[in-house]
Design a protein with these regions (language model features):
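Detector for a conserved hydrophobic position within an alpha-helical segment of the HATPase_c
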Residues: 166-167
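Histidine phosphotransfer helical core of two-component systems
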Residues: 1-13
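A conserved beta-strand-to-alpha-helix junction within the catalytic ATP-binding
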Residues: 34-46, 103-105
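Short alpha-helical Gxxx[C/S/T] motif in the catalytic ATP-binding
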Residues: 158, 162
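Short beta-strand/loop element within the Bergerat-fold HATPase_c
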Residues: 97-110
Length: 199
């Protein structure tokens, strides 16, 4: 019967997608870091999202024009921003759309302290802010763990991948969420002294 066939096809696609995400998560290569204009990365992600999964959303750019270069792998950072925009778009009421704000700013005093006592200054701040319903309170503390999702059909690997990429960049990511406003904030380092700007 057609209904059963549709169900089987749908479940098969879901399983294939899940396996692809597990493979991507396990096969992530170390970042090839260089000086990166994070605004270029955000713009690429914005344009891609508006042509695809977040076409129903309004995306606002709120950038600090004096922001210096970040130290990172532009392709991996693009994946991070795409995942965050996709999550924001999926969280919004698709009939009404919603607004995503991409914000950057410089915070010279933000420092990541590691368990071994070492630390690193992470002055470049990137935020992806949406006006969706917010994250469920019961998963807030675990949202970056694999297989934790607030959506019925979510795999829980998108934000785990985001967290792994940011960690591999010696960065930090956090989330603050209330109904009507969710903010994912990434903090990244500047390039080491002597690294030339991108060509």
């Amino acid at each position: 019967d057609l209904e059963l066939t549709d169900l089987i096809v749908g479940e098969t696609r879901r399983i294939v997608k899940l396996l692809e995400q597990v493979e991507q998560f396990g096969n992530l290569s170390p970042p090839e870091r260089r000086a990166v204009n994070i605004h270029d990365v955000l713009d690429r992600a914005r344009r891609s999202a508006l042509l695809g999964h977040s076409a129903h959303m309004k995306i606002i750019e709120d950038y600090d024009p004096s922001l210096p270069m970040a130290w990172g792998d532009p392709d991996q950072l693009l994946q991070v921003v795409l995942n965050l925009i996709k999550n924001a778009g999926e969280a919004a009421d698709t009939a009404q759309g919603g607004t995503i704000r991409l914000r950057t700013y410089y915070e010279h005093s933000f420092r990541l302290r590691r368990a071994d006592g070492s630390g690193q200054v992470l002055p470049l701040q990137i935020e992806v802010i949406d006006d969706g319903p917010g994250l469920p309170r019961d998963i807030m503390g675990d949202i970056f763990d694999p297989f934790v999702s607030g959506r019925e059909n979510g795999t829980g690997l998108g934000l785990a991948l985001v967290s792994k990429i940011i960690s591999d960049h010696d960065g930090w990511i956090g989330v603050d969420s209330v109904p009507g406003r969710t903010v994912f904030r990434m903090s990244l380092p500047r390039p080491p002294k002597g690294v030339p700007p991108p060509a």
